[in-house]
């Protein structure tokens, strides 16, 4: 009975083990496999012991030692099993953003007319998604792609025409590709300064086509292309051959892609975009131009007031990094046709988002009249530098004309083979040289005129615009401009509404003055050489001699000291009004009145050498070897009593 009790106890103990009922079935290798196709089966002892994980070992090798497989232990009796891990949530696509009607037209037009957006996964919808995410991260607020940019109607630029679509364009008018937008989002800056030349450069022959038959609209675009042809080596051919070409559409606003993308690419010149400045601006993007105010050194030239920008659009004011910049050694240009205006993306027409560090340029930035001299110089440097092999010594920032290599292309206001002379005009001249007296220049008319001021002694020129009356606008389109840098290649101060410059000083020894107007305009400017005239020693006083040439003395010179009989003065005797004999010279003590009480340094007496110590003078005093007598400093005489 004892044996039976022990056996039952052991059996019950086994049943209560936690893993008794949870043991997994034996693995597949525990069961004998199928027989070999021929021959007798192997001896039974060959199958003893489990093989390692994987297929059974070859029959001609002994199996590896058996290892106990890991058991899945269950929790102790009475505790519930742990809950299963939560299933991963299914990936949900971002909600589809509803476009406004105007934006929907733009997106469809870009996708349809630009081949780069027809590749799988690279539609312009994807660009907008990346841009929205980037702007949300930059601003910390929700970016609304349907934002309408306020327009005061006084700016004649692409921002005014794009008020309903600017929020889906990078920097208001650039339709970037997915690759370009990813670089911006990842790095926070773009690839090049104003030129995007990483494998996306056009040849010098660029074909283009029109999608609209409006003759006047086509003529205005052709005029903009001819402006580039006259000033660069680039040529545009209507309906020219080639798989890569520009497509001009009359779309919703003004926009363009940047650089050569491959295949057809759209440039939209919609209503309000048909001016020379805006057309050349958008074509400039297609040629590779970025915006000027995004240069890496821009903080030395402009201040960005992000607090005045529309919420969510702060990312539209990024600048680039020095690590990937190609500047071609050209200076910052306030007058570039690619520069933002002062109120770009502003909350209000009374707030500036972009302000020049030098406030004199506030009416210069945002130019949409025509490309500046430096805009054209940059294009010629990028596209045409290998045309003129001969070196020509151009002055004042000029460069060899790619359309005539024996001639310099000169900054506005200069001309000549080497840019050495003032540009010819009916109303401008070389002004009288600036000396140390103020001179005035005034003008009234409606022509393009040029003047130049040069200092007489090689110094700087100080000038002041005292009166201005041109057609007034926040960004001057008709203006008087003053170029005062060492080189005259960069755009100068432009004024049109009122004289606010105050006195300015040129960096070099000359100033160029340019007037551009189509209606009667006036200005008044004064100028002089900076500094004061060098001090010259006055000639000695000459006394006219009688006909007998008797010897007469000149007047006494100024006393060398102010008091105390400490100073001397002299005079010369002349034989004529032009020939004084220096040997005939008289000297005397002067200014004999006593010096006031107080502390004084030792002075050199006229009768004794230096008095080197400080003396506290309680009363009026005289220099050494002089004594105060009756209010006058007189020489000390031995044995003589001097009354006070």
Curated annotation (Swiss-Prot):
Binds 1 zinc ion per subunit. Residues 40-68, 77-89 have a biased composition (Pro residues). Pfam families: Astacin. Residues 380-420 form the EGF-like domain. Glycans are attached at residues 198, 440. Disulfide bonds join 233-384, 254-273, 388-408, 410-419, 559-590, 563-595, 574-580. Residues 40-70, 75-94 are annotated as: Disordered. Its cofactor is Zn(2+). Residues 193-385 form the Peptidase M12A domain. Zn(2+) binds at residues 281, 285, 291. It is found in: Secreted. SUPFAM superfamilies: Metalloproteases ('zincins'), catalytic domain, Spermadhesin, CUB domain. GO terms for cellular component: extracellular region. GO terms for molecular function: metalloendopeptidase activity; zinc ion binding. Keywords: Disulfide bond, EGF-like domain, Glycoprotein, Hydrolase, Metal-binding, Metalloprotease, Protease, Secreted, Signal, Zinc, Zymogen. It is an enzyme of class 3 (hydrolase). Its EC number is 3.4.24.-. Residues 547-596 form the TSP type-1 domain. Residues 421-546 form the CUB domain. GO terms for biological process: molting cycle, collagen and cuticulin-based cuticle; proteolysis. Metalloprotease. This is Zinc metalloproteinase nas-33.
